[in-house]
Amino acid sequence: MKGKFLKVSSLFVATLTTATLVSSPAANALSSKAMDNHPQQSQSSKQQTPKIQKGGNLKPLEQREHANVILPNNDRHQITDTTNGHYAPVTYIQVEAPTGTFIASGVVVGKDTLLTNKHVVDATHGDPHALKAFPSAINQDNYPNGGFTAEQITKYSGEGDLAIVKFSPNEQNKHIGEVVKPATMSNNAETQVNQNITVTGYPGDKPVATMWESKGKITYLKGEAMQYDLSTTGGNSGSPVFNEKNEVIGIHWGGVPNEFNGAVFINENVRNFLKQNIEDIHFANDDQPNNPDNPDNPNNPDNPNNPDNPNNPNNPDNPDNGDNNNSDNPDAA
């Protein structure tokens, strides 16, 4: 696969694909096909203020053979009030790799966790400390919520280009999900084709560390695959895809020129993976009384009022149950 060359100014940068790292003046190969879902743990959890790389040595990360997918619908506009509402957890990422410093995007979804792409974390070459995150970044001179250094990486066990990154607290002992409110995830029960969406992140064709939002519609949806008609470029890798309720419905990975951009859709399989690995991740319906995952739902097996819960005093399998039919009860006949 031949690399595409991109002109670089002091503020704009080159690109990384699944098979090709594109920079000026030469292209270097980098593969991100590994599907290892075992966590990569750093040797130390000590947090220091991350060094911020500026200027033209930055290279946006992108997926598949292309990521600079500017479609006829090129409704991109800059977000300057980055600390407000659902924009606050959108995060600027730098990866300090042996071959250079790369930029990407992500979204905070837990007290100490962020979602991005597998091909973004692959650029760390197994060293989580190489990945730095700057939530709500305004520009390369203004990081209102500071920076955080990764300590553990967990890749999605399925085919989707998705990864979880866990961070150490900062020097003030604050976690990344404490300086910003984590994003709310959609249960995606009502997500369908033709719905309005936005992709928000840090594209590499714009001034460094500036947040941009693209607007469009879903054009395809099946399994973990979601496609849409809005425009993105390298650096948008890992950007959250929001629905009209400002809930995260997917994580952007890249696209195909003149055709579509795409994301990992948060379907049931992805949702289960996230819940298994992020204890405090919040989905929009978690608090609903009929949600089986809600601990207050009497049908939740962990609810002590559930008659099937062995800790329920009325459960005949509970040794504290006074039912004489329970042979484990010392008061049983």
Curated annotation (Swiss-Prot):
Signal peptide stretch: 1-29
Region (Disordered): 33-61, 283-333
Keyword set, alphabetical order: Hydrolase, Protease, Repeat, Secreted, Serine protease, Signal, Virulence, Zymogen
Documented EC number(s): 3.4.21.19
Pfam families: Trypsin_2
Site (Cleavage): N68, V69
Entry keyword Signal: yes
Sequence repeat ranges, renumbered to this chain: 289-291, 292-294, 295-297, 298-300, 301-303, 304-306, 307-309, 310-312, 313-315, 316-318, 319-321
GO cellular component, one term: extracellular region
Catalytic activity: Preferential cleavage: Glu-|-Xaa, Asp-|-Xaa
S-S pairs: none
PANTHER family: SERINE PROTEASE
Protein name: Glutamyl endopeptidase
Organism expressing this protein natively: Staphylococcus aureus (strain MSSA476)
Gene designation: sspA
